[in-house]
Amino acid sequence: MPSQRRVRAPSRLQRVIYTLRTEGGSRGQEAWAIGLGLAVGFSPFIGLHLGMCVALGWLFGLNRLKLYLAANLVNPLIMPGVLFAEVQLGSWLRSGDTYALSRDAFSFMDPWHFGLDLLLGGMVLSILGGLVAGVLTYVLMGRRYRDPDFTRLTAAAADRYLGTSLTAWEFARAKLRGDPVYRAVLASGWLPASGVLVDVGCGPGLLLALVAQATEEAHDGHWPDGWPAPPDGLRLHGIELRPRAADLARYALGDVAEIQTSDAREARLPEAIDLAAIFDVLHLIDRPSQGPLVARIAAAMRPGALMLVREADAAAGWRFRLVRLGNRITALFRGRWRARFAYRTAAAWQAELSGHGFDVSIAPMGEGTPFANVLLVARRQSTTAS
């Protein structure tokens, strides 16, 4: 078994938020929570929505936070229009007619009938709105729940960050589940059964955390049918320039992985690397330094070892421009407003890696996203070119 991680316990607030974010996590429960929440929002019982959401969540085992958020889609900005529609719908259902919009009509209005119309129309609109919202949620969430084994695995890997900050935990949950590269690494047979894995520019260590969690899950007998055999005894190394991100990786992995805070161009590399992952890193360094970095890593790899390089394809039109915009915004938020990026086309990346003694294939890696990402799967030749 892998060594146990040395982590501090999450705070009470973190545990409460964790419960609210993760309870009722199946596809059907998600749909019921959104549908019932919107039904509560449309209901005429104004002032009781919070209590109704808590009670429904407890009664049916649904996510109370999502119930309440869905209820608040019917907010004060649109509530007057909703109430008007409910009264008119109720009047039409009760009497076959609607209220005339005149002062005389309202002056002779029967309060009892008005209240009955509001209740009747509100309940009908509540049921219809809830059904539509629930069905749409169920359909739209289909892709997310298409692979429940991987969803469960990513959730467990993200939980390693729970005691750091809620932001780091939420980022890990979203990134591991939404970025197709992580599932590809586990399901495509690229992981060696043993040996050395190096993640260059590992950030908070998401890939390493996922591999470590996969190893633990496999030891416990939880491994998806049809997937390649999981790693066993794989030594994990991460290299990260940013101290804060490196600290998060150390927290999540403990003594399961060695995390080095260093510039990848100067870092100490382990010997006989079996798999090197370089995700979204090379474009961050100047072009003259890209080749030497690849050569330096290649020199530390075994013959036949694998290098996985994920980059954006600069020839991909608007999808590449979207990547470029996202990177620019991220750099601004990190205070790196003068950052420069050295992008290349997928063909140019392939040529660069081939020049360092790799047999390279290109796999699209933007499924489910609007981004022009590709994964270069580079196998080091047994006899490298001089």
PLM features: residue spans?
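Transmembrane helix boundary and interhelical junction motifs in multipass membrane proteins
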Residues: 42-55, 60-70, 75-85
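Class I SAM-dependent methyltransferase Rossmann-like catalytic core
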Residues: 153-185
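Conserved alpha-helix/loop element of class I SAM-dependent methyltransferases that forms part
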Residues: 176-193, 214, 218
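Class I SAM-dependent methyltransferase SAM/SAH-binding core
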Residues: 198, 206, 210-258, 263-265
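A short glycine-rich, Lys/Arg-flanked "PGG" loop and its adjoining helix->strand segment in the class I
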Residues: 291-303
